[in-house]
Amino acid sequence: MQSALVGSWHNNGFYGHYRSQFKSESAREYHLAAKPQPPAVFLQRCQEPAQRHFFSKHDNRTSFDKGPYCLLQGIGRRKDLERLWQRHTFLRWAPCEIELRQQGPLESSYQADFRPGPGLSGLPQHLIHFVQVQPSHTRTTYQQNFCCPSQGGHYGSYKVGPQAPVTDVLPDLPGIPRPKLLQHYLHAGVSECLNWSRALNKDS
């Protein structure tokens, strides 16, 4: 009868409601008798002395956290200790050795190409002076009659030629009427503009 009850009930984490406390206390004897037996490996380990227990490195991963060799043990994952010891230790670090092993030439390509010489002739790449190229302009009859050619040979509209005055070619065009400026607007500086009322009083 006792062997039939073993393993028929196990604690699943629910202890019942507080109102069913009397009911759970009455079933405590059944729970103790019906709980499953521990594994045979656990029972054998309990019978052995503690000095013979073999703990893994994962179990002892927090035992030597403050020591100098804390980086050598695999924390949370397995690592090859021989390869790890060759790569980096507390005194030898892997990135520094990799940089020294894969170190390139001490002279850069820029230093090899552009050496300090006596002048520009020593440079492999000669400097090309900038030449300003003017765009091509279309020539019109107005530019031919009223404008003089510029330095580049193109006709511009900034300089009026003296050989063809505008008044002789177009004498019948009326002049543009411009409003006559008052006297108090014809001052040379800002200080004179502040005293424009005095100038009007003198003229009056």
Curated annotation (Swiss-Prot):
<dbReference type="InterPro" id="IPR029369">
    <property type="entry name" value="HDNR"/>
</dbReference>
<dbReference type="GO" id="GO:0005929">
    <property type="term" value="C:cilium"/>
</dbReference>
<keyword id="KW-0966">Cell projection</keyword>
<protein>
    <recommendedName>
        <fullName>Ciliary microtubule inner protein 7</fullName>
    </recommendedName>
</protein>
<dbReference type="Pfam" id="PF15115">
    <property type="entry name" value="HDNR"/>
</dbReference>
